[in-house]
Amino acid sequence: MSSTKIGVHIPIMVDEVIDALQAKKGGMFLDCTFGSGGHTKAILDASPDAWVIAMDRDARAIQRGSILANHYGERLELVHAPFADLEQAVSFKGFDGILADLGMSTDQLKEGRGFSFADEGAFDMRMDEGSGVSAQEFVNTAPERDLYVALAEGGVGQNARIIAKIIVEKRPFESARQLADVIKNAHVGKKSESRVHPATVVFQALRMKINDEIGQLEHFLQAVPNASKKGTRFAVITFHSIEDKIVTNRMRSWESAGSYP
């Protein structure tokens, strides 16, 4: 079936996702991280018998999704909720396929919300802008110990303590770019020929802290079996070893217990 020409960002691994979910056979699917809508659209285009319930904690993502919802009609239902609230937010049980893409959406990186190093304005970093503390408030007010813990748990590693100290010394910060530049100019750790920005993992750790990404992921994985049935296909796209370890361990526990999916 040919793809409908609606302007959405083409997500990574879209062909692999369609194959893993066997979306061409049709069925009821749950996209737990709607984002820019690329995976949802691909599932719906894979078969006229495919239906999707798509969740996202980001209100802007749900608003953007109205174009797809208008086009696909009753085949697409949008739900504004974090995937950790799966059991409360989605009443349907027995999905044929469940998808979670744990990466940032292109739209989020372009919206000037502090997810990008280049953002000049106030940096927020909250997926749900109506709850919790912004990254700017956390970075500018948190005790050094709390900053260190967030960085260490977020994957910064042995440099977490010194980076936390530098942040406290150089704050307040008014933009994501200012913070990224301070980290870059600090020359922490060994010199590297890598093209990866020195602040990449720091920003990852702050985003994980602000959005409680590990807690959200663990609650979501606990809810997946109750939304599944025998034969449900489950696909998760992870972007760092912390996520990967949590997902892998949970899937092994399902296998050992003989539970779904």
What do these predicted ranges mean?
Residues 1-261:
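S-adenosyl-L-methionine-dependent methyltransferase catalytic core, i.e., the SAM/SAH-binding region
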